[in-house]
Amino acid sequence: MIKIGLIGKTNTGKTTFFNAATLASAEISNYPFTTKHPSTGNAQAITICVHKEFDVQDNPKNSRCMDGWRYIPIELIDLPGLIKGAWQGKGLGNQFLTVAAQSDALIHVVDVSGGIDVTGKVTEQGTG
């Protein structure tokens, strides 16, 4: 199964996305480092099935095909927030980086409102 890590600064919505994609109920709060340990859950990536797209015989081994749609199982990993200097051990530091390195791919969740400063604290929008 493909492992995808969710990375980004603290308080950017990683756990909200994780809960929506996996139907989990991990804690969500408006303070830095609500997520202290990685959470894992299963989800599915959905794409057009190869038999429909290329008009060929389909024999999926790592997924399933239903009504022309391919459902590919993935493991999502909700990682603790990243702050400046994590590689030096700041915040949850190396604990975060070790799990991120074990992922097959990373999704960088970004808070476009600019309401989170470099330490992960909520600030006025546009100042973070």
Task: Walk through the language-model features, giving the residues of each.
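Conserved G1/Walker A P-loop phosphate-binding module
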Residues: 1-127
